[in-house]
């Protein structure tokens, strides 16, 4: 029988790894301990940095010499890193499939194997002290050698590992060598939706423990009224006694000695931790060796107790909801090798968008991340490193989850997580992993988690919550979530994944939130996911872009399915995150114009609105004419206050009220007067009366076999009788358009419409519909010339289409009123992306000015974050740089839009009549629709010499159907009868207000 390799033995989780324990550092003095800087802790040596490195084709290719002899000629790499990201071996991305043959627990013999070497000069280890090396992440299997001596082995890629290296060290130079395998038996339960990559990807460092030292501690809080009853359990080695102190930054609130490893105390008028007020006490242990303090161990400790009563979870006795996201570790330059600054920036962005919870999908994080969540106020569904999704491809996702032979591997992963992180106030519940089916090993994990800690346990694929404490679903539709609310489950419920954020989207978050707000039994929701997993790259021509699956020749792959976050790979918020932040804003408002009263509701869970101020802005036709500051005061959670606010409506124009909510306080995540959100209310609309147009010369018409040319005082407009388009339009000697209006039902495909495309549009060729012009005619109508174009727009292969009529009314002023109507024929009446027109204007540097929703990108089911106003930008700045280019730049609720060159000339689009009651949407791109649609990366986008302008009468909502929820019925656009009108006006350098003035032309 063949010998069993350690990396192919699921029953063997480690060799010589130290037992898991709370994460902490020991210091030589109290002053050093007060810094909380691990770099100043006893014997700390940072081993992250430059290492010698060589990649071997497999573990058998690594000789003992390469683990015991320094190889100065090897390459240098900077740890932490993933070697594939640094150009060694092959990057691969799959959502769920294993990139190797399924033969658990075995992996290929040509298993890429990296060997790291580093010389570390160390002083002699003090008598009785122990030298510990700690790895916070090795993927997927690591062996450690010191001075040629085998120290130990670890698995569980995203879990920390410590080894005692004391006996292998010498005074002076020491050779540390680490052998890392890309694949191991652990890879079968580490099949998370992310890049397959490997290496020492988190920090590695040395720590020193004195002869008398703390081994572990456990801190538990029980709330009784305003008091916190605290239980402390400690494990120490060689210590004569252990003394603890708890202080609030100014005063010691509790102190005592842990007798036989146990102590109890109470804190009166305790300041309990919560995500809105994440107060942390300073907990310090003094470990004595005889009469001398051997080490000081500090920990920033929140007072928090999580309890479950019926189907509700409580934090310190208070009900709450989690408005969260699923977060993977990701850095666009380093993959999963995420540094502290990146973690901080993630949490800052979350808090700045009203997010109060994270699910650590689907593995344990760097231990400092939990410390930061305590500090910033982020509640955690703390998930361990486990997913076996790839087995679904062979018909049994629970193949190893329900195999007792794999129990040690499963239990090891939850034990290490809970033991290391259970002192953190931010952790609301533990999660056993993701998408691994259900079976005996989940039950074993649950038992271990509850043996070690009392907080509730979550696991989505325990679909009936037979074992776990929290029932969960993912990607449930709005109607299904409402049904869950109407028929409550006996246990608490969360929606652990929803709102799939692939590319442009998600849409429909407001409707979800209305349901979540309605039902107390639904206690949390988590967007999938936080950040795109794109990796920064540069083409041979020097063009920057972001890679996804398949870009490295990897096959099989899941293409851009990893580009599914609310934050771009470079940590810039997407329009989807901006929308989510507004949807979950805890300052809710309603306005009663008749009563002159603004109702402000506090949807926080723990704190009042005492820190909030409101700025109420009155807008007329999009511009602010009046501001007033309001103070809601100490409105308690869940309560409302009515504030007097009388808005004077304008005699002429559209009057709107926009109320911005700011926090006046400075936080670790924001500066004072940071905006939390805004609400807008329609007050009145009194369109300006049309004024009589000045007398202008009559229009003249020239007709040839192929053209109809209409002359006005300052310009001319030419129609092609061949294809029915505006072939030329000039005003004051300048081109108004480069290509005239064409009716369209398609726009570049967005990821969230992928399932509609696969099930409807692709087979019906909606994206390649053809236009046939049947008739072009004209007539004189008073002072106007009316040109009528009849067309049929239909796909190849199929026998359905749309009979379209475009009626252009050309007026002496140069204005063109366009009425577009359509009647369908055939058997297709399902959804389509849009109903509208597109045209091109010359130049690619156009300024854009509009009155409508803004300033950011918005869509029919995603516009809460963008109130109506008067905005200015450029075409380039409107374009959203999605990693895979797709439809973007839309602005809803548009009353008018002007696109102008640097000379001030251009075109104005509005409705012929009251635009406020009948707005349209528009987008403008420096590319053609075809260019965007065919592009796979931003480097495929090549600018032409025109700007594409899209005017939409109807636009399909975004939804989140890349993997989730289709577009809600109220945001659907169907292939049905339609009719709409727009006015097109040439602009010169004259004032825009003059062009906007309503003019009645006979």
Map each language-model feature to its residues.
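Accessory beta-strand-rich segments of carbohydrate-active enzymes
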Residues: 2-8, 12-17, 37-38, 52-56, ...
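Intrinsically disordered, low-complexity Pro/Gly/Ser/Thr-rich segments with frequent PxxP/GP/PP motifs
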Residues: 260-269, 622-652
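Surface beta-strand/loop "capping" patches
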Residues: 211-238, 574-612, 692-706, 820
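Glycine/proline-rich low-complexity spacer/linker segments in large multi-domain proteins
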Residues: 2-26, 36-38, 151-152, 175-208, ...
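Extended acidic/polar, glycine-enriched regions
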Residues: 167-173, 233-309, 651-703
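Beta-strand/loop-rich accessory regions of lumenal/periplasmic or secreted enzymes
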Residues: 84-87, 94, 137, 182, ...
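Extended substrate-binding grooves/exosites of carbohydrate-active enzymes
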Residues: 1-39, 79, 94, 188, ...
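An acidic-aromatic loop/edge-strand motif
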Residues: 82-85, 90, 97-106, 155-157, ...
């Amino acid at each position: 029988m063949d010998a069993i390799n350690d990396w192919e033995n699921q029953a063997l989780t480690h060799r010589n790894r130290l037992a898991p324990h709370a994460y902490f550092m020991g210091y030589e003095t109290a002053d050093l301990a007060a810094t909380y800087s691990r770099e100043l802790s006893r014997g700390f040596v940072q081993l992250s940095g430059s290492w010698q490195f060589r990649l071997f084709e497999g573990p058998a290719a690594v000789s003992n010499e390469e683990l015991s002899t320094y190889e100065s000629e090897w390459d240098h790499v900077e740890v932490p890193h993933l070697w594939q990201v640094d150009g060694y071996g092959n990057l691969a991305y799959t959502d769920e499939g294993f990139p190797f043959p399924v033969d658990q627990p075995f992996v290929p013999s040509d298993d890429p194997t990296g060997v790291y070497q580093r010389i570390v000069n160390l002083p002699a280890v003090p008598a009785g002290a122990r030298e510990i090396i700690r790895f916070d992440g090795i993927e997927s299997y690591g062996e450690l050698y010191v001075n040629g001596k085998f120290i130990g082995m670890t698995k569980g890629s995203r879990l920390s590992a410590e080894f005692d290296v004391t006996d292998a060290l010498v005074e002076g130079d020491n050779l540390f060598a680490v052998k890392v395998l890309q694949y191991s038996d652990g890879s079968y339960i580490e099949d998370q939706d992310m890049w397959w990559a490997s290496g020492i990807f988190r920090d590695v460092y040395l720590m020193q423990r004195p002869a008398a030292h703390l081994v572990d501690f456990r801190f538990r809080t029980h709330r009784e009224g305003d008091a916190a009853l605290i239980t402390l359990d400690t494990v120490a080695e060689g210590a004569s006694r252990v003394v603890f102190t708890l202080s609030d930054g100014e005063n010691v609130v509790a102190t005592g000695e842990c007798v036989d490893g146990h102590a109890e105390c109470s804190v009166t008028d305790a300041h309990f931790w919560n995500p809105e007020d994440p107060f942390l006490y300073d907990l310090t242990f003094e470990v004595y060796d005889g009469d001398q303090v051997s080490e000081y161990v500090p920990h920033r400790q929140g007072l928090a107790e999580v309890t479950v009563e019926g189907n509700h979870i409580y934090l310190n006795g208070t009900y709450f909801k989690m408005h969260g996201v699923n977060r993977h570790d990701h850095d666009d330059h380093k993959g999963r090798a995420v540094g502290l600054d990146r973690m901080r920036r993630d949490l800052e962005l979350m808090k700045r968008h009203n997010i109060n919870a994270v699910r650590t999908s689907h593995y344990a994080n760097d231990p400092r991340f939990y410390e930061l969540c305590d500090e910033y106020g982020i509640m955690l569904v703390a998930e361990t490193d486990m997913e076996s999704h790839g087995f679904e491809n062979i018909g049994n996702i629970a193949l190893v989850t329900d195999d007792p032979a794999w129990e040690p591997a499963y239990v090891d992963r939850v034990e290490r997580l809970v033991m290391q992180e259970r002192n953190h106030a931010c952790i609301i519940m533990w999660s056993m992993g993701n998408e691994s089916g259900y079976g005996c090993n989940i039950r074993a994990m649950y038992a271990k988690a509850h043996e070690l800690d009392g907080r509730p346990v979550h696991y989505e694929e325990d679909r009936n919550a037979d074992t776990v404490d929290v029932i969960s679903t993912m990607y449930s539709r709005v109607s299904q979530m409402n049904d869950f609310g109407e028929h409550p489950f006996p246990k608490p419920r969360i929606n652990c994944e929803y709102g799939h954020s692939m590319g442009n989207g998600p849409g429909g978050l407001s409707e979800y939130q209305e349901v979540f707000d309605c039902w107390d039994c639904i206690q949390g929701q988590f967007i999938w996911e936080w950040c795109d997993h794109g990796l920064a790259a540069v083409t041979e021509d020097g063009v920057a872009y972001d890679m996804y699956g398949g870009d490295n020749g990897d096959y099989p792959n899941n293409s851009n399915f990893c580009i599914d976050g609310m934050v771009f790979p470079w940590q810039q918020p997407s329009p989807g995150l901006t929308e989510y932040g507004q949807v979950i804003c805890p300052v809710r408002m309603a306005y009663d114009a008749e009563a002159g009263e603004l109702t402000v509701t506090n949807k926080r869970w723990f704190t009042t609105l005492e820190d909030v101020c409101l700025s109420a802005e009155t807008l007329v036709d999009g511009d602010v004419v009046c501001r007033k500051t309001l103070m809601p005061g100490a409105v308690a959670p869940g309560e409302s206050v009515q504030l007097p606010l009388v808005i004077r409506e304008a005699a002429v124009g559209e009057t709107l009220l926009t109320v911005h909510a700011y926090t006046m306080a400075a936080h670790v995540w924001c500066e004072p007067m940071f905006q939390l959100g805004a609400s807008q209310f329609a007050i009145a609309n009194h369109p300006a009366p049309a004024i009589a147009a000045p007398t202008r010369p009559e229009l003249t018409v020239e007709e040839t076999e192929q053209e109809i040319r209409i002359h006005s005082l300052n310009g001319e407009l030419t129609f092609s009788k061949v294809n029915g388009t505006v072939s030329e339009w000039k005003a004051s000697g300048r081109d108004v358009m480069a290509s005239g209006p064409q009716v369209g039902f398609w726009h570049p495909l967005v990821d969230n419409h992928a399932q509609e495309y696969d099930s409807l549009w692709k087979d019906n060729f909606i994206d390649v519909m053809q236009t046939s012009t049947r008739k072009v005619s004209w007539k004189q109508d008073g002072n106007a010339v009316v040109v009528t174009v009849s067309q049929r727009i239909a796909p190849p292969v199929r026998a359905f289409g749309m009979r379209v009529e475009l009626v252009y009314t050309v007026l002496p002023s140069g204005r063109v009123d366009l009425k577009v109507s359509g009647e369908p024929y055939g058997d297709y009446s399902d959804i389509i992306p849009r109903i509208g027109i597109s045209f091109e204007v010359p130049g690619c540097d156009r300024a854009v000015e509009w009155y409508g929703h803004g300033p950011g990108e918005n869509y029919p089911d995603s516009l809460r974050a963008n109130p109506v106003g008067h905005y200015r930008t450029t075409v380039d700045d409107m374009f959203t740089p999605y990693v895979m280019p797709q439809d973007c730049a839309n602005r809803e609720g548009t009353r008018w839009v002007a696109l102008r060159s640097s000379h001030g000339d251009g075109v104005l689009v509005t409705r012929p009549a009251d635009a406020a009651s009948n707005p349209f949407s528009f987008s403008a791109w420096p590319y053609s629709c075809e260019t965007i649609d065919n592009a796979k990366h931003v480097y495929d986008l090549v600018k032409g010499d025109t700007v594409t302008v899209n005017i939409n009468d109807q636009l399909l909502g975004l939804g989140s159907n890349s993997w989730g929820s289709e577009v809600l019925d109220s945001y659907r656009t169907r292939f049905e009868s339609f009719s709409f009108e727009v006015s097109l006006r040439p602009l010169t350098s004259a004032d825009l207000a003059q062009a906007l003035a309503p003019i009645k032309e006979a």
